[in-house]
């Protein structure tokens, strides 16, 4: 294993690696290895930060690897990016390996792509990374068209696999699981890279087209007419929201402290200056899971950014830390928009079911502090969560109407494997087991809203869900006015996010795991069971304001 990479859990009883059963060791004979990175883009975004980081690492430490990007950009051309035609494109690239970075909701629509690739190129190893392989290891490796999965941080792991394919590094591919010729799976431990300074900054050239970035869609919410470049100042989030994939990852990390990793502020600003000047960047979007995970870093960063960068930017934040001083400091540094999650307008439901313990007054105060500082507000809200009632949804709408953020955004709940809320949904029999093709954000475009779980008429009927979502959509179209020009009123135009189709199915009938994170939620449900004969009627009462 790379000495710079720690492991999440050290195995003491791992069997010796049966190298004679590896189909891929020393399989690449030519001098230069051709590696294709891929990701699924159903929303139009064409930047993937994990790929940018792995590409930079490969280009620095393995110059004999040709790094190629061929993303699945289905919004650009559905026919060109169909599974059959995409596989033909990969065949034309003459690749030695293809590595997909996949989010969990995109797993099912991507499976036909793996199948078509293996039909055309049975000797091309397929590697899966991203949250899908980190959270759903067994489901991912069991796909007959998958050869390796990356189960942790991917930079050193991708370096290990290219050496494996060239026969330069005997032994297993540390940081990955490998499917052997006899069908057995050889497992290694996930990598956690604690020292980000040991890695190069992400490589954006991998996303450029023939005309540079003129035709690269790098942002969904950012301004048009300038290059909006997504950047990250670190990795990790200290919070344990029950619906978020970060929570099970945090639970497996060695310590909470090492899970939160930041670049040095001076180094980060120097990199932003380089990017600004190299690509003529007009706006930075900070894609950190939580920009404020280290307040000491934030204070230092804002001061240096203000002095050296002089570009507007947006960040993700939490209402608990958005006091007057913070918002004013952020505004002085150039912060244009703060994205923050409200998720639900019902305080009790939000705390007990979603793990978000802020009060509505904190939400209102944070929004007011932003407005006073001249910062735009973009709110995230989830609808259709397990055991949510119609009244819960109405409270979400009312709270946002009271705030009147510059951009109101709502989306259907997505059950993510391994998360506490997924486990509760599964335990209560709410997961859809047969229907794979669902919509994520495209519902707003289609004017048709359907639950991503089974209907609970005692709590929220399908008709009520559609009706309230339509009310939210009407508010969104009347309210949203996010502007990127100074002193110029924005053109009024209905907010529209391109299709984000995704698939959701739970083929695993095994019982949900009961992690420690489930206990607060299960306690709430247990109370309901005691108080009411009907779970759903009880939850209606428990979370009703």
Feature map (PLM): residue ranges:
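C-terminal accessory regions of radical SAM enzymes
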Residues: 2-45, 177-181, 185, 192, ...
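Structural motif
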Residues: 34, 96-97, 283
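Short hydrophobic segments within beta-strands
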Residues: 36-41, 70, 101, 129, ...
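A short, glycine/small-residue-rich beta-strand->loop->alpha-helix junction that serves as a flexible
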Residues: 41-49, 102-107
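Glycine-rich beta-alpha loop elements in corrinoid/cobalamin-binding modules
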Residues: 57-61, 65-193, 412-418
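Conserved strand-turn element in the central/C-terminal portion of the radical SAM core barrel
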Residues: 77, 290, 318, 345-355, ...
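Catalytic cores of alpha/beta
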Residues: 139-142, 326, 387-401
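Radical SAM [4Fe-4S] cluster-binding motif and immediate context
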Residues: 197, 204-380, 398
